[in-house]
Amino acid sequence: MLAYVYTGEQRLVLQRVPKPVPHEGTAIIRVLAAAICGTDIRTYRYGSARIRPPRVIGHEVCGLVEEVGAGGSELRAGELVLVVPAIGCGHCYWCRRGHTNVCARLRTIGFDYDGAFAEYMEIPAQAFAMGNVIRLDPAIPPDAAVLTEPLACCLNGQSSLQIGAEDSVLIFGAGFIGCVHAELAVASGAKRVILADVAGGRLALARELNRKIETVDSSKEDLGAYVKEATGAMGVEVIITACPVGETHATAMELSAARARICLFGGVPQNGKGFLDSNAIHYKELAVFGSHASSAAQNREALRRIASGEIEIAKYVSGSYPLNRIEEAFEALKNERVLKLLVKPPEGVEP
């Protein structure tokens, strides 16, 4: 079969590999749709110290069950499923409390298991054991269902923020994740949602797709002055950094109201050190939260919101590419007007 494989030394190669076969407790799916995540983009551009090669990457996935191994799974061939990629051990302190995404022995599809940028993928037995395999209603299009995991990650990021009608929300980053955070903030009843970026094309597209938000191009406008005027000099109550720029963490401290809640959602380079103002946190009584991945329960909630139409997430998909043209998709994502791309089965390639 065709697969996109991380071979080490910052190299990803489209190559033919053996089709996986089911083992005890596992299942094989034919990938119907996989989505390119920011993590995949970083691996494409810079490699990854987390991935032990060779490894098929890609972790946002839905597919059709082809084969089921012996021992435990109730799935049947022909069923549609999505797979939650972050798989806990089920036994550690955090797993026992439902926080499987911060498991002490977390293993992730596309990093520790072969992932979704392939024609077929094996679902690990531990994914079944942890409830990470979710049956899909055939009425939900795969192109929407595959976005469940990133929506669940945003739900996790906002789970500690308690956004409500009295809150102004500032989001750094107008990429796909920033736009999804904005959708959730609007749905939570925030009185105003401000999306800031330095990419004018992305901001324009975000504004076209969500008329309930405000946008600020901070390369041309004074974001501090905008926030001051918008909040009567009080500052914003909720800030989400949905971009890999550590300086936004420092700016968040400056633009926050007293007792604001801040989610550091996007990972940053340089080991993430040296961006926080400890005195600002102390004197303004700021609550600063991290966010990593999502649990199976959060994925089920995300899928419910997609299925019900509460969150219109598929509108942020700019298009799709067949697997045999996946590198074109990665290059296309450099365009400011491209927010999210899907990878579909290859054209004219026999399994």
Which residues fall in each region the model found?
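Glycine-rich phosphate-binding loop and adjacent beta-alpha segment
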Residues: A190, V245-S308, P345-P351
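NAD(P)H dinucleotide-binding glycine-rich loop of Rossmann-like/cofactor-binding domains
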Residues: H91-F172
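Glycine-rich beta-strand-centered segment in the early N-terminal region that forms part
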Residues: P18-A34, G47-R96, N101, I134-D137
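Short N-terminal strand-loop motif that marks the start
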Residues: M1-C62, I123, A127, D217, ...
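Short amphipathic alpha-helix with an adjacent loop that forms part of the alpha/beta core around
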Residues: D222-G232
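Mid-domain Rossmann-like dinucleotide-binding core that forms the NAD(H)/NADP(H) cofactor-binding site
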Residues: P138-K220
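C-terminal hydrophobic helical "lid"/dimerization subdomain
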Residues: M1, E221, A250-E254, A296-P351
